[in-house]
Amino acid sequence: MLIKNSVFLITGGASGLGAATARMAAENGGKVVIADMQEDAGGKLAQELGGRFAKCDVTSEADGKAAVALALKEFGGLQVLVNCAGIAIAERTIGKEAPHDLGRFTRVVTVNLIGSFNMIRLAADAMAKAGPNAAGERGVIVNTASVAAYDGQIGQAAYAASKGGVVGMTLPIARDLSRNGIRVCTIAPGIFETPMLLGLPKEAQDSLGKQVPFPSRLGRPAEYAQLARAIIENEMLNGETIRLDGAIRMAPK
């Protein structure tokens, strides 16, 4: 799938990995719809890139449908979905005062796993109704998991479960959508320069970066976007989760 003239719907596109992907798409001739809850940042970036912004809670069917509809209305189609929206918490299964709050666990799984699936099913439905390109492709879907899906740390039960679910559904969804000419892959980033990590003191950031075997630094959002581009452009990449982590394997804590 060529980036040029493809229409992108990017959840969590107002910042971090999603924003870098939106910039990559626009710089290479793609048309971008940023779907996010951050109206100010998302709207500003969309305007800068000549794209559109949709306020979108990925767990909402109505919001998801509206974001897809905006892409179809404004740009005449939808070829690429990149799921970057997500949340994280740190909470042990049994705390000092009480067991893990069930509502907080449910919220993380709902946003990260169910929210991703919600956007996949809605975007894929729109993609499947369009005509294929010369290679028979109708669309590409890129999800975001995490190395926590494999190396979940202490306090990451909810987050690891949610991202493990994203990894687990990648292959079956790719197989489901193969007859429609839609490819599905997932990126599992390691420790990256996201807004959350950049809020830490510089010493803490450097310490985290040194845990990465090579290169011994935090990953850059542009590197995530670079891999997303490779997935989109390579027709044979399908049904796979790719770790983007500098060979790190997370310690228990």
Where are these regions (language model features)?
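Alpha-helical segment proximal to the catalytic Tyr-Lys
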Residues: 125, 174-176
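Catalytic Tyr-x(3-8)-Lys segment
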Residues: 110, 203-223
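Residue(s) in the substrate-gating loop at a strand-loop-helix junction
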Residues: 146
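Conserved mid-core segment of classical short-chain dehydrogenase/reductases
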Residues: 88-106, 125, 129-135, 155-158, ...
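C-terminal substrate-recognition "lid" of short-chain dehydrogenase/reductases
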Residues: 220-244, 249
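Active-site helix of classical SDR
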Residues: 120, 162, 170
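Canonical Rossmann dinucleotide-binding motif of NAD(H)/NADP(H)-dependent dehydrogenases/reductases
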Residues: 2-33
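Catalytic Tyr-X3-Lys loop
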Residues: 87, 98-118, 142, 159, ...
